[in-house]
Design a protein with these regions (language model features):
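Small-residue-centered hinge/linker elements
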Residues: 1-77, 85-168
Length: 168
């Protein structure tokens, strides 16, 4: 016979588990899961399982803020459980929890911000391909792979990276 999934799980107190087990590119699923478990009266604690090298700054910030808010406003304990890797944004998310659990071998920390892009201008020139850029501002084509970076662009990007790093 087939037993519906909900009927197969005994009633009573439960622990909600939010899994973040890949590079962090979006906060949507984790925040939805956190909200769901926070609303459910039969969920008595929330575990955020982290197995991630980190990822996007904005997505990591959004998850961290939700974890921290639940920690500060809910009676439910929220526990960060680190797997083999919980680095950068994963570490940041864990900081919002009431408790952080890690194994001695967990690779964690590594707070930093990186930006890179290829510069293919010479290759394009060798192929005989020409390109034109029309822009509305001096930095609008910053980061274009078709040209070398200028001193002004490097300073702009370094400031951006430093600002994002300081938000950690």
């Amino acid at each position: 016979s087939i037993i519906p999934w909900e009927d197969a799980i005994p009633s009573g107190p439960k622990v909600g588990i939010v899994e973040i087990n890949a590079p962090i590119t979006s906060s949507k699923k984790a925040v939805e899961d956190l909200n769901y478990f926070n609303r459910k009266s039969n969920i008595v604690a929330i575990v955020v399982r982290l197995e991630t090298p980190g990822g996007g700054v904005a997505a990591s910030q959004e998850i961290y803020e939700k974890v921290r808010k639940i920690s500060q406003t809910s009676h439910k304990p929220i526990i960060a459980s680190m797997g083999g890797v919980a680095a950068s944004g994963g570490y940041y998310i864990a900081l919002g929890a009431d408790t952080i659990m890690a194994n001695p071998g967990t690779a964690t920390g590594s707070i930093g911000v990186i930006m890179s892009y290829p510069i293919v201008g010479d290759l394009i020139d060798k192929m005989g391909i020409q390109y034109t850029t029309i822009k509305s501002g001096i930095l609008k084509d910053s980061g274009s792979p078709f040209k070398d970076i200028t001193k002004e662009e490097r300073a702009y990007f370094q400031g951006l990276i430093d600002d994002l790093h300081n938000q950690f």
